[in-house]
Amino acid sequence: IQEVLWRIYWKGWLELRPGVWADYLINLKTHREKYKTDKNYLNAIEGNTNIQCFDDWVKELKETNYLHNHARMWFASIWIFTLDLPWELGAEFFLKHLYDGDSASNTLGWRWVAGIQTPGKHYLASEWNIKKFTNNRYEKIKLNESAKPKASTKVYSVSKNNFSNSEINDVKTLLIFDNNLSFEFSDFKDKKFNKILIVNSIESREILLSDNVMKFKKSLLQDQLKRLKNLSIDCEIVKIEDIKKYGDDVCALYPSVGENLDFINSNELKNIQFLYRKIDQLSWQYCNKGFFNFKNYIPKIIQNIS
């Protein structure tokens, strides 16, 4: 339960500070241009750093599209402090290759390792820790174990958002995005929507996905389509560009801060009425501070859900 709520917390934290995501994308574009021919960066993404554990994780990530949480932390720390590469590029590399890549937990996790999510507190990978938890698989791991946290003077104020749901009628068309593909288990499963549109934004992203991740996400879209049709629900998959042509009778399972919401906002699609999950409504109000403060409210959140 705590692991699930970790992700919900990260999403809520970013919802209250959407400027963090916006600034991440701005800085990412700058670093892409600066490092596009940088040998150190190119060696890192190809797994040619001569740091065996890191190179193995690059290969594992590209082939399996997954890394254990320990490996993710070690990877990010080595990227930032030993290879001295911008955390923004590392976060992009993860989003490109992870099946479970998420704009909030990924961005904020990399910020935490760097020492800017919790200012002055960073995560430094160490040789002994890697050896211990990999059963001494690796030897002579030369890392920068004395690096200082990355500095950031930017302070983000907490925004006051309204996550309440307005009354919806049954004639509306519903949009579902790729991070909400369980409609039949959602809070809105009993609503009789006119039609459900499953939005494909896989090829229309600022951060391009690997072929494996695109295939995986497309299979999830098809699976949701199949399950909805089995329930005799009128539905189809549409490209994200096509949602601009729908009128006012449109609502959407809220996609959260990230690329799908960016598309909606950049195209000024103000006609879309967002629907928020109950667990998010209950949780995000407590995301104004750190996780350990949020953790105190978990029993209350669970009680209110049930």
Question: Which sequence ranges carry the predicted segments?
Answer:
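Active-site-proximal binding-pocket segments
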Residues: 1-170
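Trp/Phe/Arg-rich N-terminal binding region typifying the photolyase-homology
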Residues: 1-2, 6, 11-12, 16-29, ...
